[in-house]
Amino acid sequence: MDLNKSSGLILHPTSLPSSYGIGDLGKESYEFIDLLNKSGTEIWQVLPLGITDNIEFSPYSSKSSVLGNPYIVSLDNLENNIYNEHELNEIKLPITNEVNYKAVYTNKDKIFNLISERVNYNDNEYQNFLKNDLIKRHLTFITLSEVFESSWSKWTSDYQNFSEELFDMVFDEHKDIFMKNLFIQFEFNKQWQKLKSYANSNNVRVLGDIPIYVNHNSADVWLDKHLFDLDDSNNMSFVSGAVPDDFTVEGQVWNTTLYQWDNCLLYTSPSPRD
């Protein structure tokens, strides 16, 4: 078998320069692709692109394996004139060598809340996007997570398991938050697909990455508890990590959820979740 060698470079989009304190899927990403193409570099490797929490801010500890990171959505690339320059200028930050995640999250959340009030959610594009059942389930979790501001294992029994009835209740009671998150995910998906197509058309392939385990406080664990090693209170029975090696002499504690491997092997179709 012939194997062709390729050159690549690893750089997460968040590490690109930006006026908003964090690299995103906007102009700088396109310019980076141009640089790779010009230098003959064929692979752009990125870290996981999922939603990061406001504690560790780690791409390897996401709240959803399905939804994208809101904070790398390019504000400048939002369409339909749903923002004004004054609003964006108010949240711009100096370009530095480090990301102030708390400031970035606060600023972008403020803009997303403003913009969400101006979006026409009756547009067929949004309605069709929501027809994806997996996206709907994960958005339900993200909305509840934002409402309760706590781990799902601490929620009352009414919110412990997904059902269509729960979705209807969440949608009715927290429609503004749910639709804001829908808008963000719609924009992420559109911007990412456009950026990836641009990369491929310029002879650059995108190499992704996924974490070995998932965050306990995630839609993945909430939706499929039987696939994870949880105790009677739905907390982690054990946590993931790595043994000592040449890089970390004391070993590592990843603090993510272990799998219930026997159940994973039996899992061949979606389980009843109501």
Name what the model sees in each region:
Residues 267-274:
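Conserved small/polar residues in nucleotide/adenosyl-binding loops
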Residues 216-265:
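Active-site-adjacent "subsite" loops/lids of carbohydrate-active enzymes
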Residues 2-225, 230, 262-263:
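Acidic/aromatic-lined carbohydrate-recognition and catalytic surfaces
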